[in-house]
């Protein structure tokens, strides 16, 4: 078993353990492998180990990888855009990705809707919440959620699937859980209003257990699978 396959198995075990401890089934939590800055060869190793959902933060890099695997005839992969989205890059996301986790304003949602090719299924979108109210991060407040969700739900080429957040780093489990629970409450409310909503993208390597205990349905894990990132390229 190579390193990536071994790492994936360990991460899946951690997810299963975290789910079991709070009475949830492991299948309720999707593992999103964050492959930003990693070469296609690393993704190929993850695919060989059964991984199908991948997250990319940089539009151009992600599109190159998507094209690489399409040209190689590899099907059944899911590509999630999880980085900050600028208006001038929205067309590439709309044309190539299956999911966008970082919708935080109507302007971006409208552009994605207009630019999504008609022959593709609707782009699955998550509304990004700035749950820790950090100026350095994208996302809306929970107070602004209802209005934006209602507007996105009207766009025919987008499918509102839920919420995403990147909480501020917290070392204590109790604090992590308290923040995650705020997201879980908002997610539960959203689910009652929109039948397509089923995804709470919350939790990374350091806070995954608390996120799963609070109700996360998707965790985003990178370094624990692929190793340290090289940002020099």
Report each predicted region and the residues it spans.
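Expand to "…catalyze enediolate/carbanion chemistry for C-C bond making/breaking, isomerization
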Residues: 210-213, 221, 225-233
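Conserved alpha/beta-domain cores
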Residues: 1-206, 214
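Conserved N-terminal glycine/acidic-rich loop preference
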Residues: 218
């Amino acid at each position: 078993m190579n390193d990536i396959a071994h790492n994936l198995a360990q991460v899946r075990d951690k997810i299963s353990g975290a789910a079991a401890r709070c009475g949830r089934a492991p299948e309720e939590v999707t593992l999103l492998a964050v492959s930003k800055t990693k070469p296609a060869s690393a993704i190929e190793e993850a695919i060989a180990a059964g991984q199908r959902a991948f997250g990319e933060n940089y539009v151009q890099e992600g599109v190159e990888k998507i094209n690489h695997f399409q040209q190689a005839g590899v099907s059944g992969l899911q590509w999630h855009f999880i980085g900050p989205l600028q208006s001038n890059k929205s067309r590439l996301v709309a044309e190539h990705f299956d999911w966008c986790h970082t919708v935080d304003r109507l302007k971006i949602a409208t552009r994605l809707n207009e630019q999504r090719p008609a022959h593709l299924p609707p782009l699955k979108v998550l509304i990004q919440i700035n749950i820790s109210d950090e100026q350095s991060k994208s996302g809306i407040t929970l107070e602004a959620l209802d209005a934006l969700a209602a507007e996105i739900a009207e766009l025919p080429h987008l499918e509102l699937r839920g919420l995403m957040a990147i909480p501020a780093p917290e070392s204590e489990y109790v604090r992590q859980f308290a923040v995650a629970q705020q997201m879980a409450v908002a997610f539960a409310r959203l689910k009652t209003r929109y039948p397509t909503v089923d995804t709470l993208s919350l939790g990374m390597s350091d806070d995954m257990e608390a996120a799963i205990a609070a109700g996360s349905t998707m965790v985003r894990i990178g370094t624990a699978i692929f190793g340290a990132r090289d940002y020099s390229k």
